[in-house]
Amino acid sequence: MRTWIFFFLCLAGKALAAPQEALADETEVIEDLTTEGPVGANPVQVEVGEFEEPTEDVEEIVAENPCQNHHCKHGKVCEVDDNNSPMCVCQDPSSCPAHSGVFEKVCGTDNKTYDSSCHFFATKCTLEGTKKGHKLHLDYIGPCKFIPACLDTELTEFPLRMRDWLKNVLITLYERDEDNNLLTEKQKLKVKNIHENEKRLEAGDHTVELLARDFEKNYNMYIFPVHWQFGQLDQHPIDGYLSHTELAPLRAPLIPMEHCTTRFFEACDLDFDKYIALEEWASCFGIKEQDIDKDLVI
């Protein structure tokens, strides 16, 4: 999860912007973890009741909550039925936490703005089993807005920036990975070779002509980043194919800033089966067939 949090911070900062222009169910972008310090960490901290009069020890029997370890997908919450068994039911959208920030809002494929991803998934859950619910997905982060059509010339430029951005994200993770465990040892070894290559094009707002020349000149530097990104997305399940749901963590933050995102991913699905295989993904980024290797998805 730490990798994805950092991943989206990179998305918000760089946004794959071109020189002429300024990150199952879709995954929520931010996970908030809080940890309560143990009693005794502060020298003056005492347990409640430390100075109370001694009383007879009585063993307290605490009933285990059946929902405690029962996981429900986004849009559902756990409830206990008449047999004290946990079950997942649709969450009431009105029970979602109130959000006021514009970046908390999300846009659905129904072109409707939802107050938060919680409100979106709760609404989607209530539509389960319907045609509308089947077609409804989280489209992008932020309120709905006009997304201009992607021209053919713009579509050819998109993978140039995306490829370069993937390479730079990996290099940044590598440089900041001393204690964060953002990359595995195998991944670090692959990125190290790219990082130490003096011919590497440094991060920056480059023209598409320069990006195209660099890809041709330093083609081998881009092979692993493309495979790595596929592996980051192929998670639910890990089956060698990317569904609309699995693409969401990458698509959702990009669409408001890169209007060719949707058309690009649609074009990657060469056989129109609603899934993008590794071969289709790599081909979309210009990786040659002989260089597509499942063992690089690590």
From Swiss-Prot:
GO BP field: regulation of synapse organization; semicircular canal morphogenesis
Q: Which SMART domains match?
A: FOLN, KAZAL
Which Cys pairs are S-S linked? C67-C78, C72-C88, C90-C125, C96-C118, C107-C144, C150-C260, C268-C284
Signal peptide positions on this chain: 1-17
UniProt keyword annotation of Ion transport present: no
Question: Gene3D superfamilies, per this entry?
Answer: 3.30.60.30, EF-hand
| Cellular compartment(s) | Secreted, Extracellular space, Extracellular matrix, Basement membrane
InterPro entries reported for this sequence: EF-hand-dom_pair (IPR011992), Fol_N (IPR003645), Follistatin/Osteonectin_EGF (IPR015369), Kazal_dom (IPR002350), Kazal_dom_sf (IPR036058), Osteonectin_CS (IPR001999), SPARC/Testican_Ca-bd-dom (IPR019577), SPARC_FS (IPR037641)
Q: Which GO terms describe its molecular function?
A: calcium ion binding; collagen binding; extracellular matrix binding
Q: Might you report a single GO cellular component term?
A: extracellular space
Q: In which tissues is it expressed?
A: Detected in aorta, skeletal muscle, calvarium, vertebra, anterior limb, kidney, heart, brain, skin and lung.
Q: Which terms are listed as keywords in the entry?
A: Basement membrane, Calcium, Copper, Disulfide bond, Extracellular matrix, Glycoprotein, Metal-binding, Secreted, Signal
The glycosylation sites are N111
Q: Which residues form the Follistatin-like domain?
A: 66-88
Q: Which domain of life is it from?
A: Eukaryota
Where on this chain does Ca(2+) bind?
D269, D271, D273, Y275, E280
Task: Give the Kazal-like domain ranges.
Answer: 84-146
Stretches assigned to the EF-hand domain:
256-291
Q: What biological function has been recorded for the protein in this entry?
A: Appears to regulate cell growth through interactions with the extracellular matrix and cytokines. Binds calcium and copper, several types of collagen, albumin, thrombospondin, PDGF and cell membranes. There are two calcium binding sites; an acidic domain that binds 5 to 8 Ca(2+) with a low affinity and an EF-hand loop that binds a Ca(2+) ion with a high affinity.
Member of which family? Answer: Belongs to the SPARC family.
Please give the name of this protein.
SPARC
